């Protein structure tokens, strides 16, 4: 428990909860029948089922991103029709409190009126120019002003693209080929990163992916997250050969796993000593833990940063940036080639600008911390009350919990979680009108639109479901 105490001391809420096992009554007939509903109330996902079955004939697995298929939690994938604020409605008319937030972008709430109004005005002028637009300058300046490591930025269309660009950049700048990443960290689906990856790869139980040639990953070294000694050993064994260390400063794609107090400092020191670069993948944490991202929150400045999600306000976007001398390697300023047809399109720039404007308002991150803390404390408390071994934590608007005693410091710890129990919990919460990420190995997100009432309803639902499972 010393690790948990240290995490709390550094401003991170980690609460392992152990409770004795208790006997439970047999499941009710309604639960067995509905698989997602605890009560005899009307809860149907018939239209979702019909649409999803049709989708499976049209798209691989019926989805365009694997985790949406509910493979790891079971039950019927939900087809959504509309969103607003902190709530979502499916095609059957069911309403849910949302803690996925489109996997992170919806930090100010879904379908924000001001963002939508700005998008309508931009839309009147066109959706994409394939040429420079003034809005790129505005968002670029906002990003550069906010993120400590970024002196120049390149916009792309996804977090995966951002990490692909950053990977090529660090190799071009250093003249080295090897990279070091951490087990369970996900940096998109580029070949070089699909080694002991998290996110959907973890959900499917695949250590990597067929179709990735050995040559693509021969230069990818891996270490356990939060293990500075393992990193130092890899640098000793590969002296002068590692181009960069890539990491999620707070892991979100193996569940929510914060760094130990000295870990990020150790990475900064070892990379500087060896002439390697430090890359923070802030696609998830950027503008969520603080306006300047995890690097502002922890006070550690990397050399290169990747961004996505929030900076597009819900539209497809990504970015990578860093020191000016590094970024000037990127074409057309330098020889490292990277391009994109829709990069910097006016719609994504508009949504990003107006989302960041909202995040600049006083009290934003204090509010996120308040509601998220209430949520996590509430769920862990009812977990203990109902006899479940659970642990979890949060930083500002990012959170997670595991059905394990904890503490969870790395991917191996995360894999000790009872994923079958999480699946039952997830299905039960759907029946109670709460939408959580359909995988134990994904972080959750709150927004400025979440209310105390949302949190109270969620905790009440969690207690009900936990008593069932």
From Swiss-Prot:
**Gene3D superfamilies for this protein:** Aspartate Aminotransferase, domain 1 (3.90.1150.10), Type I PLP-dependent aspartate aminotransferase-like (Major domain) (3.40.640.10)
Question: Per the entry, which co-factors are needed?
Answer: pyridoxal 5'-phosphate
What InterPro entries would the database entry show? 4pyrrol_synth_GluAld_NH2Trfase, Aminotrans_3, Aminotrans_3_PPA_site, PyrdxlP-dep_Trfase, PyrdxlP-dep_Trfase_major, PyrdxlP-dep_Trfase_small
> Its GO CC terms?
chloroplast
Location in the cell reads: Plastid, Chloroplast
Q: Which residues carry this modification: N6-(pyridoxal phosphate)lysine?
A: 309
Q: What is this protein called?
A: Glutamate-1-semialdehyde 2,1-aminomutase, chloroplastic
Query: From which source organism is this entry?
Result: Hordeum vulgare (Barley)
């Amino acid at each position: 428990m010393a690790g948990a105490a240290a995490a709390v001391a550094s401003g991170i809420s980690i609460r392992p909860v152990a409770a004795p096992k208790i006997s439970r009554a047999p499941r009710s007939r309604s639960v067995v029948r509905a698989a997602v509903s605890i009560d005899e109330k009307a809860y149907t996902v018939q239209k979702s089922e019909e649409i999803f079955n049709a989708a499976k004939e049209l798209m691989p697995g019926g989805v365009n991103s694997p985790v949406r298929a509910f493979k790891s939690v079971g039950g019927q994938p939900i087809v959504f029709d509309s969103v607003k604020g902190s709530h979502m409605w499916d095609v059957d008319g069911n309403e849910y409190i949302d803690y996925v937030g489109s996997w992170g972008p919806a930090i100010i709430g879904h379908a924000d009126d001001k963002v939508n109004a700005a998008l309508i005005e931009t839309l009147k002028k066109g959706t994409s120019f394939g040429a420079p637009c003034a809005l790129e300058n505005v968002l670029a300046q906002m990003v550069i002003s906010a993120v400590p490591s970024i002196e120049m930025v390149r916009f792309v269309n996804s977090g995966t693209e951002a990490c692909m660009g950053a990977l090529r950049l660090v190799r071009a700048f250093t003249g080295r080929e090897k990279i070091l990443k951490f087990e369970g960290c996900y940096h998109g689906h580029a070949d070089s990163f699909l080694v002991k990856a998290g996110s959907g790869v973890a959900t499917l139980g695949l250590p990597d992916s067929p179709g990735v040639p050995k040559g693509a990953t021969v230069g990818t070294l891996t270490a356990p997250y939060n293990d500075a000694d393992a990193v130092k050993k890899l640098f000793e064994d590969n002296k002068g050969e590692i181009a960069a260390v890539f990491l999620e400063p707070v892991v979100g794609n193996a569940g929510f796993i914060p760094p130990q107090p000295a870990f990020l400092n150790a990475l900064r020191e070892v990379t500087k000593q060896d002439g390697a670069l430090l890359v923070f993948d802030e696609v998830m944490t950027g503008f969520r833990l603080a306006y300047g991202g995890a690097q502002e929150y922890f006070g550690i400045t990397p050399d290169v940063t990747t961004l996505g999600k929030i900076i597009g306000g819900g539209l497809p976007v990504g970015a990578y940036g860093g020191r000016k001398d590094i970024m000037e390697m990127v074409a057309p300023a330098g020889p490292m080639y990277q391009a994109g047809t829709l990069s910097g399109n006016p719609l994504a720039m508009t949504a990003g600008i107006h989302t960041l404007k909202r995040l600049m308002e006083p009290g934003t991150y204090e509010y996120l911390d308040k509601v998220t803390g209430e949520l996590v404390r509430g769920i862990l408390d009812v977990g203990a009350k109902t006899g479940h071994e659970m642990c979890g934590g949060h930083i500002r608007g990012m959170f997670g919990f595991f059905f394990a005693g904890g503490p969870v410091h790395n991917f191996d710890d995360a894999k000790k979680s009872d994923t079958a129990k999480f699946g039952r919990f997830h299905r039960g919460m759907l029946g109670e009108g709460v939408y959580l990420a359909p995988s134990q190995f994904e972080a959750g997100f709150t927004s400025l639109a979440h209310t105390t009432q949302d949190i109270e309803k969620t905790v009440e639902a969690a207690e009900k479901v936990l008593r069932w499972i």
